[in-house]
């Protein structure tokens, strides 16, 4: 089972890589697909009663033309739409392979596959990939984000395999507790959703810069993604959903488990410190997002700072710090 899990892991990364290439192809031919046309559809400025009935052009508008002549050409094969559908299908295949990787890993170990850094990363990226498929189902217009979601999945899963791989083994004694299921599962779910939330947050900043007339890299990447308002709203909803879960897992279940295992609720262990820092930063983001005087771009930068602290907690603490949570370098959580 352990060897099968490793093989499925390799296939998972390949599937996400193929999905990324397909998303990139749709991105390149985006104006020909329905999703691409929705992303770049020109806005029209509304005029009040008594004003001229002609539409007023705003920057980015297309000149008025005959509806028949402005319609996209009908071709036997709409390459953009085809690549997009292939990308979603391959992405879904990657999710199934990802699930198989975790299931076979758990069967081989005789426990939930959350016992070390390698398994934790695989579980977080799995939650992120499932959350992405749910978002796609509810908001198909944001499909162009798939290129960047798949890129994150490939990079993180590849890093898990190259840097954090740990052979299947039993749990360390400190993890033999029912709190293991409660604490770690909520942290995994919250982290996976926050991972996904970082993608529209980044693209919102890029799209906002593009809308302001910036035409250098990386702002040119914003040309074919959804409207900035759509991306910002998706960013907020993902973070608002994940934050209560992260609060429960990091600041309630974690301290209760610590008291049961080590006789104290909080010991300022490096991972505890960085989890608290992440919580504070994400709380600041939600507060800034709810404050009318704070620009949405400023609030979004705070959200990305929160994600940076999560990465520090995952890689930096596990690989470079010693503490109660770093049980065996990359093998610990």
Residue ranges and their predicted role:
Residues 1-333:
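Polytopic transmembrane helical bundles with strong interfacial aromatic enrichment
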């Amino acid at each position: 089972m352990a060897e099968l899990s490793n093989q499925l892991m390799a296939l998972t990364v390949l599937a996400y890589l193929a999905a990324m290439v397909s998303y990139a192809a749709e991105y390149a031919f985006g104006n020909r697909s329905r999703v691409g046309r929705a992303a770049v559809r020109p806005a029209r400025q509304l005029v009040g009663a008594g004003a001229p009935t002609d539409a007023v052009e705003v920057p980015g508008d297309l000149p008025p033309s005959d509806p028949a002549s402005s319609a996209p050409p009908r071709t036997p094969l709409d390459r953009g739409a085809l690549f997009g559908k292939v990308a979603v299908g391959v992405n879904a295949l990657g999710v199934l392979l990802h699930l198989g990787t975790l299931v076979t890993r758990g069967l081989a170990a005789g426990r939930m596959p959350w016992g070390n850094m390698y398994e934790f990363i695989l579980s977080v990226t799995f939650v992120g990939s499932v959350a992405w498929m749910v978002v796609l189902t509810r908001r198909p217009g944001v499909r162009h984000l798939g290129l960047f979601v798949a890129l994150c999945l490939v990079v993180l899963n590849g890093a898990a395999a190259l840097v954090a791989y740990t052979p299947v083994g039993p749990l360390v004694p400190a993890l033999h507790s029912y709190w293991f299921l409660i604490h770690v599962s909520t942290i995994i779910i919250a982290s996976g959703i926050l991972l996904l939330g970082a993608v529209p947050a980044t693209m919102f900043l890029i799209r906002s810069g593009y809308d302001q007339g910036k035409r250098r890299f990386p702002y040119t990447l914003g040309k074919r993604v959804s409207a900035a308002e759509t991306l910002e709203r998706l960013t907020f909803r993902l973070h608002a959903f994940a934050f209560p879960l992260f609060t429960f897992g990091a600041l309630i279940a974690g301290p209760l488990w610590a008291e049961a295992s080590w006789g104290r609720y909080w010991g300022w262990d490096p991972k505890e410190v960085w989890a608290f820092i992440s919580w504070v930063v994400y709380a600041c983001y939600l507060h800034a997002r709810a404050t009318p005087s704070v620009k949405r771009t400023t609030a979004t930068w705070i959200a990305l700072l929160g994600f940076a602290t999560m990465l520090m907690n995952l890689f930096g603490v596990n690989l470079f710090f010693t503490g109660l949570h770093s049980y065996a370098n990359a093998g610990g959580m």
